[in-house]
């Protein structure tokens, strides 16, 4: 259409379209007019006209609406609008319009005549006389009659064309075009079609899956649930029954063969006519009596009453091969079979395999609740009833589904079959994988003949073979190792509690109830072998005898059963009491001690674990509990979901130690007490050192490298750290500093073996506590490993290079890191923890270990407060490092020398430059400390003064400097001699490169004057 239509043309076209579909248009208006006011919004009026009549351009609709006094801000009386439209077009609407009240009454009267089920939505008494199946059948019939109208109405309620409408809107549409249903019944009805009241409805998918358009004419003749089923009587009699059967089973041959094998696992075995007809009705086609009789004349010409399955399967395979060579061009039609026939074959199949079916159900319901998840139930049904389609499965679940939880009441299904309780022989639960493999591999077993198969199930279960002692012991071991709940429950039915004892008579009854009957001689031998005493045996005593491989009292050890599959162990749920019993043992098997378990569980390294961390630890130990059982487990431990544990509390749980009066639970003090928890980690590391020093001093001393001039061993910070890491006891830098301060109380930087052992509470023995026997080299009376200085120099150089690379990367990512910090700081405190800072840097592309990050922060002078960092200071430090590196060379001399980025070779030279340029200031600072003017200050005070003048001098650089001067073990340093002769030392360092053998002797002479014994 290239030009706009005139007003007259619009009136004629709209009028013709409206009055051809006047009933549908009126229903659409009333659908929108929920409150029955007779008014709709102008936008809704236009949407109805464009949906049911014709599309209008904006200028056309503006012209049309102006003529009928329709304004954007005023509601429209659609009855008046239709009357005016009819008057302008000289049409008579009396047959469908008239008074609005009369129209509503007539509409209700017509709705009441539609079906006997129709009535007032508010009155549920009428609906109670009909089952949900009856309602569904009539509902489907009415929907098929109004399919196109419902489709248009749902499309009108989807202006965005997204394909979704609300559940309430769907109900309004269906109530308008079909009949009004009480909301409670409507929700139940929609659940049958897979719709939920809490989610948006994909109305296109609903209509497509619920009712195909090409089946409208068929569905008008009968209920929709059978609209796709094959009515054999409607087929031509001239068509051969075999040809028809093959046509219907073309895409279902695999399911048909599997169903036949489930009924008869022997491929060439016979099958009764009734069984064969059930399978055909479910999987392929529902045959009439005459058609089935015609088929039997071909498959059973001798009228023996049985069908040879191998012959029929061969016919199917031959038909498939022929169709592959000459494909059929006819369109395939999916078949939805009658539910009555499907339900009958399902019940019959379950009854034939009752024991295996019940065992598999119980393997998913260890607590015997009678409930099973929908997905698990579907897996089981596909094993036993592979012919079950999704539509049939939904139909089955709708009858036995628990409305509250959505789970399946499988005991209700068993009751429908006529089984009120468990099978005659109590099931012996085995892993689900084993059940599946056993059932799917039935063709490997010998199948009894037809006469024996047709006997009642009860006759088979009563004939039970007597078991030997070895077989029973084998089963016992399997029960205990797999934690079989059925056997344990039966045992506790007699003993009442795990510690309660049962007598010999009750024990034999347990064996018989669990499918292990024995004769008197074998039973007497069994009680002797398992150590059954006169006073009886408890379940705990019984289980303990089978947990360890060498069972007590056994003359011959039976072969070990196969270890249960990992999938079974992971899915095996246990009770809170079982978890309480297994937790300490599993912890010892998986971890060396409680500290290792706590360290692995405490992922954020804050010294605190919550109940989520504890639950994750249980899963790691293969202790799987449901959520409610986990809460019960916490209750047995005296805990709640909201509490936290420090290491001491966790250790008490693992080792079941009584609380001491000085060990108040940390959660009673405050939720997070990180300082106390770091001390607990230090205490654990200290206990490790105590144990090693007492029992394995030779292993511990391998990490101690130095002795003093008298041959006594000395320890430094890195020696203790290397020892802890060698024993797999890593500590955070903050925790290690606390531990080192515990030993280095005088701040000398080193301690002797005597001092170290005294801190450990061990008496020093010169004969035992000796340094590790290695070659040492003498430097000024101190024996140090020759490689030590080289290793430390290399380590210091590597750390400096890493720090420079990290600084460059942080400069490049400065903006991204700043945004990430701002986003994570929701409380706007400007502080974040070290762990979170690590995580943010890693996400931004700069991965640093805690040690590297700590080194970087210390080099930039960024302080920490309770293991938290002010990220604004951190960002400022990054900016300053960036600006410092970008300054021109002529300004570098005016800036203080930063030692953070210097390599080890430059440290001594730079300190010498600082000393030369700041002689007077250094002398003043040392004099302030040396108030008595002795010329000596403590080594710690000496280091602090140097750090004040040497910008960002690191601890490892300072200690390297002291060892380079050979004064790292001196408690007091002559600062006056240092200021006067330090430049001479630097000159001798240069000479030593060419005259190393002379330098050592000269070095002794130069620095002997520094040291006062």
UniProtKB/Swiss-Prot annotation:
Kindly list the positions annotated as binding Ca(2+).
602, 604, 606, 613
Gene Ontology cellular component? cytoplasm; cytoskeleton; nucleoplasm; sperm flagellum
Assign the protein's first listed, main location to one coarse class.
Answer: nucleus
- Keyword ATP-binding in the entry? The reply is no
Query: Modified residue Phosphothreonine is at which positions?
Result: 732
What are the recorded Gene Ontology BP terms?
A: flagellated sperm motility
> Molecular function (GO) terms listed?
calcium ion binding
Q: Which PROSITE patterns match?
A: EF_HAND_1, EF_HAND_2
Q: Which UniProt keywords apply?
A: Calcium, Cell projection, Cilium, Cytoplasm, Cytoskeleton, Flagellum, Metal-binding, Nucleus, Phosphoprotein, Repeat, Repressor, Transcription, Transcription regulation
**Cross-referenced Gene3D superfamilies, in alphabetical order?**
EF-hand
Span of domain EF-hand: 20-55, 145-180, 251-286, 287-322, 352-387, 482-517, 589-624, 695-730, 731-766, 812-847, 917-952
Does the keyword section mention Repressor?
Answer: yes
Q: Where does it reside?
A: Nucleus; Cytoplasm, Cytoskeleton, Flagellum axoneme
Superkingdom of origin: Eukaryota
Task: Name the segments for region: Disordered.
Answer: 441-460
Tell me the subunit arrangement.
Microtubule inner protein component of sperm flagellar doublet microtubules. Binds PARK7. Part of a ternary complex containing PARK7, EFCAB6/DJBP and AR.
Function comment: Negatively regulates the androgen receptor by recruiting histone deacetylase complex, and protein DJ-1 antagonizes this inhibition by abrogation of this complex. Microtubule inner protein (MIP) part of the dynein-decorated doublet microtubules (DMTs) in cilia axoneme, which is required for motile cilia beating.
* Name of the protein this chain belongs to: EF-hand calcium-binding domain-containing protein 6
